[in-house]
Amino acid sequence: MKSPALLLVVALTATLAAAPAVKPLKALLVIGGCCHDYAAQKDILEGGIEQRANVAVDVCYSADKGTKPAFTCYEKDDWAAGYDVILHGECAADINDVAKIRRVLAPHLKGLPGVNLHCAMHSYRSDPNFQKPVASGTDGGLWFDYLGLQSSGHGEQSPIEVTYTDPTHPITRGFQNWTTISEELYNNLRVHQGAVTLAKGKQGNQETVILWTNEYGDAKTRVFSTTLGHNNETVADPRYLDLVTRGLLWACGKLDDSGKPKEGYGPAAGTAK
């Protein structure tokens, strides 16, 4: 006759074995356009995120290297259906059609989290005077309202000193300040009220916000953004990929207060697509 203790162990083992695995977060990376090696960066980001968290990344890539790249994923009205988060890696400075921008923003306005990388901050410029601060709540400020920050350009590439200004935030907790390779430091024309600065970057005497969060619209959608990430070496840097992955998990509500993935969302829990 088997002992009660042995039966308990067997029962617990069977229960754990039968427990369904946590489904991975479904992320869509929209990437392509002007001025960057997106053919390489799409793979770096996809692999880097999936190695760090229980996330399945689909890629919507445009090989168009112009400033008005076309993305097939945006053609459907319900283009974001089935996804838990969208990563915007577009470089689409001259897409200024308000209807198109509203289509891109529609799921975020309803609560779908967003992550925005580097040149996404210089995309969807619907105001011809984007080089000056644009008022919130206007057609010209649509994309900036979503981001929580308005940037219009950058200077020459040189190393950026990264300083974490809020080391207690789950996204940045435990991270050490560092210096990038030669990179582009984006300017800040306006940091919106409600945006939370997490890090600043410095080149010489110029210092700007380079990492922040925002709550967008009435749904208070979680949005995470960083202006870092021009060069492949930076995008492939483990410190950068750690940041992006944490930002994604935070946006989805899957990052605990210590900066670790919540149960089931760490890399060991990942499953095949």
Write out the residue ranges for each language-model feature.
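Bacterial N-terminal signal peptides
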Residues: 5-15
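Helical hinge/lid and interdomain linker segments adjacent to catalytic or ligand-binding clefts
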Residues: 20, 26-30, 37-123
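Extracytoplasmic/secreted proteins, especially bacterial periplasmic and envelope-associated proteins
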Residues: 29, 40, 44, 99, ...
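Active-site rim elements
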Residues: 32-35, 91, 155-160, 229-238
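Catalytic beta-strand/loop cores that center a nucleophilic Ser/Cys/Thr
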Residues: 50, 56-58, 149-220
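A glycine-rich, often tryptophan-bearing local segment used as a flexible ligand/cofactor-contacting loop or short
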Residues: 88, 93-173
